[in-house]
Every structure is written in structure tokens, then in C-alpha cells.
Amino acid sequence: MGQKINPIGFRLGINRTWDSRWFADNAEYGQLLHEDLKIRAYLMEELKAAGIAKVVIERPHKKCRVTIHSARPGLIIGKKGADIEKLRKKLSEMTNSETHLNIVEVRKPEVDATLVAQSIAQQLERRVAFRRAMKRAVQSAMRLGAEGIKITCAGRLGGAEIARTEWYREGRVPLHTLRADIDYGTAEAETAFGICGVKVWIFKGEILEHDPMASERRATESDNQGGGGRDRRRENA
């Protein structure tokens, strides 16, 4: 089962937590769920250049709090915070409620599965050789502390007439071990020959305590230990 299921969904409530953190009754649950989907789709399209790793949505008492994890937060914030204010107003219109916006910097994008998948997809669209893009991503992740990584690319790779799947793996990626901290991300590359799919699994070590927030807390501590840059976390009320 661990080989087929989404590794993040498999570990929810064990060492991972949900990206949508709110409760609702049956009457409004569907509406709020669709709002979340629209918000994520809008942010992923609008902020494509900012490298969005994930979007966390919380809804405390008829308000909405959106936390964007980004590799390039400066592109979201803009000059003197002008862009982030426009974005906050747009999200307020979409949710019909007061919206707060937080920006959190991802200081090690090389070990974030979603950002790695997006990077490989962008390289495929620029006609970079898929083997070179995959090997470079594997080497960068292992150099920056990943204990294991697996990448698969599927589609008409290199313009071949018959679609196929190619993969690389280095280190351990124990998908069936629930205490393993596995990050998983996907992306699509729209090439001239059709769409190529990219999947990335990154093993960051084991989490022994039973805590749904453990993975998120561990990622924050790892970013803080990385040093070098100033804290780009910003809250816009």
C-alpha cells in the first residue's frame, strides 16, 4: 500500500497535518472546500515565479488566514508591501471575509519535493535533457541533507514517439514506514510533444514522536539552522 498511496495522505494525523485547518457543518462545508481549491489554483497560477511550496488555509471565526510557503517571498511582497496588499484584497473578495496573509520563506528549496518537481518541469519546458535535470536535482538534495530521494518523469521524454517512464533514486526512500518523514510533490511540464509528469519523493529522516505537527516543526527548525538569510516571514492583517 505504501508504494501506491500518496505519502502525505498516508501519514496525516501521524507526523503530518492537513493544509486546510478548519471545521464546518454540512451546510457550508462544500462551499468552503471549493473556496480553498479556488484560492490554491489562483495563487499557484498568479505566483508561479515565486516558487510556491504549499498554501495553508485556516478559518478562525468567520475570518480566513492564508499562509504561503515560498522560495522567493520578495516577489510576493513587492516594493514596500504593495503587491501583498493587492493580493490580500483579491483573496478577501474570493472568500467574502476578512483575510490575513502570511508569507513564510522556504530556505532550502532543494529539499522541498514540490519545488524540486516544479524546477524539473520548468527545465523540461526549456528543452533541458531530462536525465541532466533529474541528476542535478538528486545531487542538490543529497548535498543539502536529504537522506534519500526518488524522481520519476513520464511522457514523451526527449520527443520520443512512445511515452515512457524514467526514474532515479539515491539513498533510502522507505514509503511503507509510517514514522519516515517523506515529502512528496508533483508537477506537469507542457512541452511541444505533450505533457510530461514529474513526481518527487524526498526522505528527510525518521520522526519518532506521534505528533501531526512534527514534520512542519522540523522543517522550520531546519530552515532556521540553515542561516545566512534574514527571516522573511511577514504577516499582513
From Swiss-Prot:
Keyword Ribonucleoprotein part of the UniProt annotation: yes
Organism: Sinorhizobium fredii (strain NBRC 101917 / NGR234)
Matches recorded under InterPro entries: KH_dom (IPR004087), KH_dom-like_a/b (IPR015946), KH_dom_type_2 (IPR004044), KH_sf_prok-type (IPR009019), Ribosomal_S3_C_sf (IPR036419), Ribosomal_uS3_bac-typ (IPR005704), Ribosomal_uS3_C (IPR001351), Ribosomal_uS3_CS (IPR018280)
GO molecular function: mRNA binding; rRNA binding; structural constituent of ribosome
Record-linked HAMAP family: Ribosomal_uS3_B (MF_01309_B)
GO CC annotations on file: cytosolic small ribosomal subunit
Keyword hit for Disulfide bond: no
One annotated GO biological process: translation
The protein's name in its UniProt record: Small ribosomal subunit protein uS3
Subunit structure: Part of the 30S ribosomal subunit. Forms a tight complex with proteins S10 and S14.
All copies of domain KH type-2, residue ranges: 39-107
Functional note: Binds the lower part of the 30S subunit head. Binds mRNA in the 70S ribosome, positioning it for translation.
CDD domains referenced in this protein's UniProt entry, alphabetically: KH-II_30S_S3
Record key words, sorted: Ribonucleoprotein, Ribosomal protein, RNA-binding, rRNA-binding
